[in-house]
A protein has these predicted regions:
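Mg2+-dependent prenyl diphosphate-binding active-site environment of isoprenoid biosynthetic enzymes
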Residues: 9, 13-257, 268-278
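Short cytosolic juxtamembrane segments of multi-pass membrane proteins
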Residues: 281-282
């Protein structure tokens, strides 16, 4: 995956050099790579060509990296640490960081458009649409808007879930679905099960993030711990308490496994990823 990202990103010596260095700084050398791993695992289940999945995985990771750059800016979460190193706007400057995020988003769609990923033009256009919807106001960006508007407010559990279905879950679902769409090995009912799995692990990822924000150190997380409570953000922990939030993560893991049950051993990697998402310590 790292080699693919290196290949798709602009070389640092190409003008504008500072912008390209910032883009590479934000994308390379860190992160769990959960979204690309989901793309590859779903692609394997759907008998997809790994070369196609690699393109999808890189595009999704670029969208994710752009979102992190913007989330960390002073006008949003105002964070100074990401993946164990200074955030992009700290390492470079705020304007360069903003532009790096702005440039990564269209680059993701550029590489999707430049490669044959599906067996028909219509199917490939649908893949572009899936990533666009997951990234925009009806997906990740919309979830961030809800998040910013919710600071200092008491949300109900359904309201919190709606926020994270958009903010975190949308791109995780897109990563999984796009990996599978690179292949043709799934029947419609199997695809529905995969989508159910993706929605469930997307929520589980956020529940665990909320738990770790309370329960892990900054050194372990590679980002500032305790930020949610300090900023009075509604979280699964603030609504449910730590023990109940942990239990919810386990319930979601069981749901994810259940969605995959008809696939048997073919879905082993997807099960492993559900386990990692819930059991991780960072």
């Amino acid at each position: 995956m790292e080699a693919a990202l290196q290949r798709f990103l602009p070389a640092p010596e190409i003008a504008p050099e500072r912008l390209h260095r910032a883009m590479r700084y934000a994308v390379l050398g860190g992160g769990k790579r959960v979204r690309p791993l989901l793309s590859f695992a779903a692609g394997e289940l759907a008998l997809a060509d790994p070369a196609r999945v690699e393109v999808v995985a890189a595009a999704v990771e670029m969208i994710h990296a752009y979102s992190l750059i913007h989330d960390d800016l002073p006008c949003m979460d105002n964070d100074v640490l990401r993946r164990g190193k200074p955030t992009c706007h700290v390492e470079f400057d705020e304007a360069t960081a903003l532009l790096a995020g702005d440039a990564l988003q269209p680059l993701a769609f550029q590489i999707l458009a430049e490669h044959v990923l599906a067996d028909s033009p219509g199917a490939q256009i649908e893949m572009l649409k899936i990533l666009a919807l997951a990234s925009g106001s009806r997906g990740m960006a919309g979830g961030q808007a809800i998040d910013l508007a919710s600071v200092g407010k008491a949300l109900s559990l359904p309201e919190l879930e709606l926020m994270h279905i958009h903010k975190t879950g949308a791109l995780i679902r897109a990563a999984t679905v796009l990996g599978a769409r690179c292949g043709s090995g799934l029947a419609p009912d199997e695809f529905e099960r995969l989508e159910r799995y993706a929605k469930t692990v997307g929520l589980a990822f956020q529940v665990v993030d909320d738990v770790l924000d309370c329960d892990a150190s900054t050194a372990t997380l590679g980002k500032t711990a305790g930020k949610d409570a300090a900023q009075a953000k509604p979280t699964y922990v603030s609504i449910l308490g730590l023990a109940r939030a942990r239990a919810l993560a386990e319930e979601l893991r069981a749901e994810a496994h259940a969605a995959l049950s008809p696939f048997g051993a073919k879905a082993a990697r997807l099960r492993e990823l559900a386990d990692f998402i819930v059991l991780r310590k960072f």
